[in-house]
Amino acid sequence: MTKRREFIKKSALGTAGIAIGGAGFSSRSYESIIGANERINISVIGVGGRGSAHLSAYSQIKDSHNVRIANICDVDEKFWAEAVKTVQEKSGFTPTTEWDMRKVFANKDIHAVSFATPNFWHALGTIWACQAGKHVYVEKPISHTVLEGRKMIEAGIKYKVHIQHGSAVAAGDAMDFMKNGGIGDIYMARGLCLKPRDSFGITPDSNPPVTLHYDMWLGPAPWRPYNEKKGHYNWHWFWETGNGDTGNQGPHQLHAARVGLGKEEHPVWISSFGGVYGIDPKECAQETPNTQTSLFKYADGKMLVFDTRGRYTNAEGSNNTTIGNLFYGSEGYLEYSGGWKAFRKWEKEPFAGAKMKAAQQDPKDLRGSVGSAFANFIDVLRSGRDQDLINHIVGGHYSASLAHLANISYHLGGRELHFDGAKERFINDPEADALLTRKSGYRKPYVLPDKV
């Protein structure tokens, strides 16, 4: 928590000139605390993919937390009917619909917004929402670049709103077990993303579907003709809109690895390399790597390693893990993939784990599931206690930045990069610094503001 406070102060004072003192964590610093008896009206922005989970989560707590999904917003109107039907069936209420998020922000009846848009819309949408006084839940990765994450933090501070991020929360009991010395001094954490990623083909450019407001969908990205293979979901695999699997699945495991190492800071050394293997470029136009290894070192020498392997590969660990984490300590190691188990030294059988009495999770511990983050978000809107957010935007920035820093090294041929985390600049490397933001700039009017 101390490092989080320090980062917020530095980010605000260093780049925005906002004198916040310790107010960022005081309930009295938030002017828009929502009373216990007042219904909280939510707009879910982006309902074609991950947004469906947001609809379900808020519907499940509609009575216990007095929440209503008052609006659904998506630039593709083809998703509206199913989203409205879901809300009707799960909550008994019919939400309004909108394709332009700016109109949602102008609606004074909306208290908070929940973003499940593509990555490249997260920062600008969040900043606009903050400027309108809306609290924000934003999916992982919180940003498309390192600079965007910093601007989001500054906006939350300036407009005194809460921002929760949607990286999978690391299981509280596993993290506490390691923090309390369960496997000794942890010196390395690994993250695994071993998802099969086959060719998705090539199609010629075409007119966008009549249901899609394409200019708004493209937003801050450079203008390009509509192409089905660069649209819904496949935007992940093109640099102007996505961050590859290192920035797609990666933030979940990077987040868990960082938390397990006890790091609320940036690494000081980065190198990442890989490529597109096993796919004929004549049959698939993918730009981001399907195979990538990213290495990070922190100031105290602790290491983080992240592997993306989208072609034929083995699973790892005793659980045959394909999506998860491995932690290595001076007295043993721990496997984490939903559940977890710890091994002493060279022993073959675990001595602690998620289903063992040695480490049972407190049922009140909200860190153990993604769904709990939605309820926690609403709780904080009522209490005003920013420090109670289990997935605070600052942590989301550290986790997302790992993916961004890795991709910067990848773009530069995998070369070693030295990073000054306090300044969020590379050391004597203007070529790398240029990649901390959009290399192509921001397309008007969807421009990231210099001052939020």
Annotate each PLM feature.
Residues 225-234, 370-380:
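Active-site-adjacent bridging/hinge elements
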Residues 284-372, 421:
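NAD(P)-dinucleotide binding in Rossmann-like oxidoreductases
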Residues 135-137, 142-216:
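A contiguous active-site-proximal alpha/beta segment in oxidoreductase catalytic domains
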